[in-house]
Every structure is written in C-alpha cells, then in structure tokens.
Design a protein with these regions (language model features):
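Hydrophobic, Leu/Ile/Phe/Ala-enriched alpha-helical segments that form helix-helix packing faces
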Residues: 28, 85, 131, 182-185, ...
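Short, hydrophobic/π-rich interface segment
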Residues: 141-201
Length: 233
C-alpha cells in the first residue's frame, strides 16, 4: 500500500521515516518469500494506523525533533513490525534496526571525545538545548543537572512517549531493544553511559555520561538485566 493512502491524522501524527521503512522492508525480505512480502508490509502499515488511531495527539507532529529518524514514531513503526512479525523476528534484530537508524549520525561525530573538557562542555550544551525542545512539547520531560567540570554529565527523563506507548500496548518486552542504542551512541563519542533505570521499569530514565577513560566507568560496571536492558551497578 502506498504510504499516502494510509488513513491517520496527519496534522497530529507523522509517517514513519524513509530510513525506518527501508529497515522494515529489509527485515521482511529476510524472513518471507517474495510472494508474501507485500502482504506482510501492508499488515505492518495497517498495524501502524491502528496504533495511531488512539494515540496521543499532542506530540508536535513534524515540528517536534523527537519525531524524526529513530524517534518516537519510528519506534511505533518498529513495534508494528514486531507485532506482525513476532514469529520470525528476534530481540537482537529489533535492537539492530534501531541502531541502524540512530548510529549513522553519531558515526559522523567520531571526532568528538568526551574525555576532553571542550567536547564534554559542548555535549552538555547540546543536552541543555534538547531540554528546551522537550519543555516546548512536554513529551520527554527532561531535567539537566548543573555542569560540574570534574564530574560526569547528568540528565534524566521522567516521561517518555515511547515507553508510555509500549506500556499501553503490552510491548514492554521489546523496549530494551529500543533503549539500548543509547549506550552504543555514547560509545561512538568516546563516552560511556551509566544507567540504572528507565521509564519502562522505573520512574525515570537516567543518563550519567562521562569519558570512556573516566574511573567512574570502572566503578559502575555494565550488565544486562533479565529483561535485556543494558544497565550499570
């Protein structure tokens, strides 16, 4: 089905991104014979429309930067794929799909080194700018701790639409595959993410960010919990 024929409130919502569509079609091609692929894709499209039919309409549409590639609506599209293709997909595949959407941008920033004060301060300023966007839309409720020269950067979300959506539709089992990309993205900036909670399994999603040479990293070793979340002690 052509994307333009999908019936949903396009003033309030956005269509999945082109890179996201490409990812889903590629995975469908891996799992289904050519004669079935279009039918499976249409099922994913229809599931996406069903999901949006009773989804909140205050997320800003195209104006909100969180609704771009790999953002809230792409997560909903990936969850649509997961629902339709659960019998053939896997946790790692979903994790890989989100990585393929998010990580290309961070690979372009490989010159950034969070171990160096200049870049760490610049990263902090980027998070502060992101907070101003969150404050405008009240989607990801974000707070950023004051900057301290010799300490890790800290910010947290106390609301996450993707987590809210997953909880509403009983899809929290796949959320770790969508959240873990946060760790991989920081690693590309010579940084490490230290996290103890997410909005799926707690009241906040915490981000403590430091350089990958910082002793703080060894003090908080990473592990995967029983749900598949990358977390730290």
């Amino acid at each position: 089905m052509k994307d333009k024929k999908l019936l949903f409130d396009r003033k309030s919502h956005v269509l999945y991104s082109k890179p996201c569509k490409k990812e889903i079609l590629a995975k469908i091609a891996l799992h289904y014979p050519e004669t079935e692929r279009e039918t499976v894709w249409e099922k994913v499209q229809r599931q996406y429309v069903v999901f949006l039919s009773d989804w909140r309409t205050d997320l800003g549409g195209k104006k909100n930067f969180h609704n771009g590639v790999g953002g809230t609506y792409d997560c909903i599209a990936i969850m649509s794929y997961y629902v339709v293709c659960k019998a053939v997909t896997s946790f790692r595949e979903i994790e890989e799909m989100e990585e393929n959407l998010i990580l290309p941008t961070f690979r372009k920033l490989k010159f950034v080194d969070c171990n160096k004060p200049f870049w760490r301060k610049l990263m902090y300023k980027a998070f502060v700018r992101a907070k101003s966007g969150c404050d405008k839309w009240h989607d990801y409720e974000m707070s950023v701790a004051p900057y301290e020269t010799d300490k890790p950067i800290y910010y947290e979300f106390t609301a996450c639409p993707a987590a809210e959506f997953a909880i509403k539709h009983g899809l929290t089992d796949i959320m770790p595959a969508l959240c873990n990309v946060d760790f991989a993205s920081m690693e590309l900036l010579h940084a490490r993410l230290i996290r103890t909670n997410t909005c799926v399994n707690g009241c906040r999603c915490d981000y403590t960010i430091c350089g990958d040479h910082d002793p703080y990293v060894k003090e908080h070793p990473e592990y995967r919990d029983e749900a598949g979340f990358r977390r730290n002690k």
